[in-house]
Amino acid sequence: MRVNITLECTSCHERTYLTSKNRRNNPDRLELNKYCPREHKVVLHRETK
């Protein structure tokens, strides 16, 4: 079952990305390196609750 999630920047805490994940394959919180438009660089983004 795929679920829509929001990714939050770890440095500026802005929620800029929406994505989906499969809870059966990835039960933990998702962490991806994505581009932050506020900081103009690639930063770690974490799944929000």
UniProtKB/Swiss-Prot annotation:
Keywords: Ribonucleoprotein, Ribosomal protein. Disulfide bonds: none annotated. One of its GO terms (molecular function) is structural constituent of ribosome. Gene3D superfamilies: Ribosomal protein L33. Belongs to the bacterial ribosomal protein bL33 family. NCBIfam families: PRK00504.1, PRK00595.1, rpmG_bact. This is Large ribosomal subunit protein bL33B. The lineage of its organism: Bacteria, Bacillati, Bacillota, Bacilli, Lactobacillales.
